[in-house]
Amino acid sequence: MTSPEGAQNKEIDCLSPEAQRLAEARLAAKRAARAEAREIRMKELERQQKEVEERPDKDFAEKGSRNMPSLSAATLASLGGTSSRRGSGDTSISMDTEASIREIKDSLAEVEEKYKKAMVSNAQLDNEKTNFMYQVDTLKDMLLELEEQLAESQRQYEEKNKEFEREKHAHSILQFQFAEVKEALRQREEMLEKHGIILNSEIATNGETSDTVNDVGYQAPTKITKEELNALKSAGEGTLGKAKEVEVKKEIVEKVGQRETLQNSEQEQPKPNTGKDCVDRGVSHPGEKAENQRPAEDSALSPGPLAGAKCEQQVQSQDQENTSDLKNSEQIESHKVTNKSDSRASNSPEQSSCLEGLDSEVPGPTEDLKTDLGKGSFEPCPDYILGQTAEIDKVTCTDSRGTGGNQREDEVQAGDTTVEDQVGTVASGPAKQSKGTENHGESCLKDGLGQSSERELTQEVAEPEEAIVQIPQAGGENTITKADDAEGRDEKPIQAEAQASPGAPINQSGHQDTTGPGSTDAQRTPPHAKERKKQGKSEQQAEALDSPQKKTKNKKKKNKKKKAATPAETCRDANEELNCQDPDVGDMEEEERLQVTDKKQASGSPEQKIRAGSREPVEDPQSGSSGKQNKVEEDGPTEGPTDILDQNSPQCEDREISPVGEKGPQCDTSQIGSEEGHVTSQHGGQAVENHNLDNSDLSGQLEGFNSESGGQAREEVGNSKSKEDCTMS
């Protein structure tokens, strides 16, 4: 009995609280039913037992009552006949009935005992039956719960089985990928072993490649050398870059000091005929290369210290490339110091020209000048450029007034000195810029020779020349007046004779027209040519101040300029239509038509244009707006008359370089356009505004010129120029 209760307790423990309450309710109901059944059975047994006890008494009474009548009847029958003889037989019948009654009572008592025992055993069996039925119910409940657990286990088994299948599939994929990666790694190792490359972070230092790239069998690791270890130890806590920068600064400071002492010592030495020697060396050897001329100039200008300094600077040039910004700043300061000393020490044209050649031949200043001219950056180098060219122009002016007859010789000498300066620049510069610097030399030679050929011309037509300089042609040709055409033919032999001597720059002059916008030739304008622009502007300011009486005439001539502006606009519209049809051929013709209109305006109001030119910088708006196309070829002949006018004018001694003009050579395309718009808004001249508009429109059209049409453009310019000379003569 105890085992089912223990099982029931376990079952109750396993069930939830609600199931436990239901099970307890069922058990309580069953107990109550069993208790009632026991009470009913006990009452029934007691009643049955009472009946059994009462029945023998009733049976005995009933038997006695039945026997008495029978006996009486028997006795009466026996007694009615022979009563005496039948008396013994009646006594024996009574004895038999009593014995049978006793036997019946004994058997009845035995049956009652058996019945009682059967009732007790029946009750016990009933109790056992109820207990077994309760156990069956509990076992049924446990079976249901186990069935539920089995179903849950089966569901979990299915989920685990599916998850296992997924993991198995992923494992197979990863195993396949692992095999592929392993194969790729094996191939990589084979390739590395084939080429002899060893992958190790401790082998290569500072990006050095291993020496075993081309050697298959040799795989020894490259180690840090003793010099690198010493360099790392000497650096200390600071980085290698800072230590190297400090060393480079020290070297630059020492080099600048040596350069200053060298140039000061050379300036103090008297050189009586150095200018003529420079001309002879720069002109008399046309077959020599720029590299052959450079050692001769170095030996003539500096006997010992210059050569030593030059070699030292060439040795240290590799260290200077790593710190180009520091080098440029230090060299700019050195140029300022040396050029101030040059301007104080220069007393003759020969000494100033030779010092200019010396500065161009020293490697340091040459590289600085190369970066200033090539990049067109806004660095403080205009002080250095002005310091040299101002001296040359002032000395040439005084010499032209003093010598008189030797005027042409001095101009040739100045031009040849400039050529020698540019040849020195060619020799010291890199090979990729040799073509551009030789073109500069050729343009400088044209500048010097143009001064000697047009000096007498500009004395007669000084004022019209001032106005025409402001309107240069975009094709590299200069505007020439009637006086220029008349006297230019007589001076052709002089120009040809002067141009025959320097051969190397002139041979390469044919390449200048073919350069497109933004080329190296257009970016490198000689510094003395830029200075002559500034001096021409200051000359025009001086003439405008000295002639206040002409201002009243300018008011009367404004109406003429307004009338002259309309032909320029109509000509510009016609030129735009012609450019749409024939852009290669029509550009030069419309430029010539525009120049005829500009010359009429210049001849009609020269004083007003000189007054406007005194405020407006003499620059080429076409070349500025079109990327300075062919600016080297334009500056040579165009700026020559301006310089000659400065030398022949009475205000030559009193002229000063205006601070506004110093910014002119460094201006780029946007600054030139903004400066022109500002100038036209100040003095409000209709003619100058129309010229700027026409030239800016033509500059946009000239951008379509390429290097292939350069030869055709030059031929058309020559033909149109000859036709123009005939018509104007």
UniProtKB/Swiss-Prot annotation:
Biased composition, class Basic and acidic residues, residue ranges: 40-65, 277-297, 327-343, 435-445, 482-494, 608-618, 713-729
Coiled-coil intervals, chain numbering: 94-194
GO CC aspect terms: cytoplasm; nucleus
Region feature (Disordered): 40-98, 253-729
Composition skew (Polar residues), residue ranges: 260-272, 313-326, 344-354, 506-523, 667-684, 693-710
Subunit-structure text: Homodimer. May also form higher oligomers. Interacts with FLII. Interacts with MYD88. Competes with FLII for MyD88-binding, even in the absence of LPS.
Function, in words: Transcriptional repressor which preferentially binds to the GC-rich consensus sequence (5'-AGCCCCCGGCG-3') and may regulate expression of TNF, EGFR and PDGFA. May control smooth muscle cells proliferation following artery injury through PDGFA repression. May also bind double-stranded RNA. Positively regulates Toll-like receptor (TLR) signaling in response to agonist probably by competing with the negative FLII regulator for MYD88-binding.
Name this polypeptide is given: Leucine-rich repeat flightless-interacting protein 1
UniProt organism field: Mus musculus
Organism placement in taxonomy: Eukaryota, Metazoa, Chordata, Craniata, Vertebrata
Encoding gene per record: Lrrfip1
